[in-house]
Amino acid sequence: YITPDEFNKVGNQVQQGIFEKYMSDLNQQLRIPENDNEYANRVKNLEEKLDIFKTIAEPTFSVDHFTTASLPNFYRLGTVIYNDTIEAQMVERNEWYKIKRAPLLAPTKKQPVFLYEDTKISVYPTSITSDIQVSYLKQPAMINWGYSVGSLGQYIYDSSSSVNFELHPSEQVDVVTGILLYSGVIIQDPTIIQVASQKIQQEDINEKS
């Protein structure tokens, strides 16, 4: 068997792998010409799975920029909103240089822009130092099989310190299969590894067919 600590490590690795696969799968689907209902359903299904991780929060302002480092479990930036209603436009550094050279294109509080580099969100005009909210994808919370150790050395489940998986319910089979695969590696059971690997390969084929 594997210990609760080993389960937690494996569970978090499996959950993170499934979560990050959403990104690559969605990018792949968005590159396919939109020509049938099957395409739309695949994109819709992926977006539904990502909805769990979409959130809104206020980033911290420091000196001359806002920072995503202050956002809980931050993974990927979505939109930047000023004063609850105005969506700022993201620009690249080379675009910003062009804007600076053209007074008629200067950003205003009604039409703000922002640069996003590393964890920094630089909003223009620079008079905007508050009232900024961002939508973003957050990382899944770290799962935890909470437990205490009994008098005989047995593990006793503790629901008060446990954290469940945050993935969509449809991922249950993939979670179990992934945990079985890693568990087989930990306990060095080639049969479990083989069965779990075949199951994962078949799931990948089914998703792409």
Which residues make up each language-model segment?
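Glycine-enriched, solvent-exposed interface loops adjoining structured elements
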Residues: 1-209
